[in-house]
Structures are given as structure tokens and as C-alpha cells.
Amino acid sequence: FIHRYPVLAASGISGPKLRRGDKQVPEGVYGISFLNPNSRYHVALRVNYPNAFDRRMGVKDGRKDLGGDIMIHGKASSVGCLAIGDAAAEELFVLAAETGIKNIRLVIAPTDFRKNAPPAVDGSQPDWLPQLYTEVAAAMTPYKAPPSGSLLSLIFN
């Protein structure tokens, strides 16, 4: 099933995370690699960024330090992570612990590609961005489109 949470704070603009310190939230299909019950932001779930696609595109572009340590966490502020508030983070943390992190697929996208076209790619974006958005759209396709809003979708398999 899919469970969606409102994102209260995230930094950056539409487009993928490219390097450490760029303040971007990754876009793509990820898993959860670690649960942190002692986060400064209440509780946190670590996103497995960079994934294989991110690493391949980093090699292709000659980028070495892609960054990492991307979290979904409580509170209402963030730089490069996804803040969903304490209550939602706690609920998600428990769901992830009970489901098992190996059974979670996290889709992070600038829009819901089942209802909206991908954002236009300009000259400042990587040439592989359409390929990324095709992969993200394919990950969303099997699931019914939910209501609109700035939301984080987690797919529990």
C-alpha cells in the first residue's frame, strides 16, 4: 500500500541532488537504510541516497562527492532532508520498524507524474534528468493517484 505524509519543510528547487552541500532533496526511487530513534529532529529514517542510478550518473558526469545522510525526520525545518513533523515522523518510524526497512520503497519526485507532466528541463539541469523522471513515473504507475498536495509517498511492499 501507499502511505502519504505532508512535507513541512525541504530545501532546494526542482531537480536532483548532485553533490554534498547543494541543499537539494534527492529525486528518485529509494529505500530506507537506517532508523534513528535519537535524532536531533525527534526521530529519523535515513534514505539510501545515493542509489545505484545516482552513482552511475555521478560517474557519467565526473562528480565524486554526491553527499548523503539524507533523512526523513520530525520537526518543521530542514536543509536537504524531508521534515514531516514529529507526529508523522513517529508514525512513519513505527510503520517502518514493523514493516521492515527492506520492504519499503520511497518515491521522491517534484510532482505526481501520474497526474502532471515532469517539470521542463532547462540547460542548467543534467541531460539524464528525463531518464530519471521516466524511472520515477514507472515506480508510481502501479498505484492509484492520490489527492493533490506536497506529499511524501512511501510504498510498503
Model-identified regions with their sequence ranges:
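Exported/periplasmic cell-wall-interacting domains
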Residues: 21-157
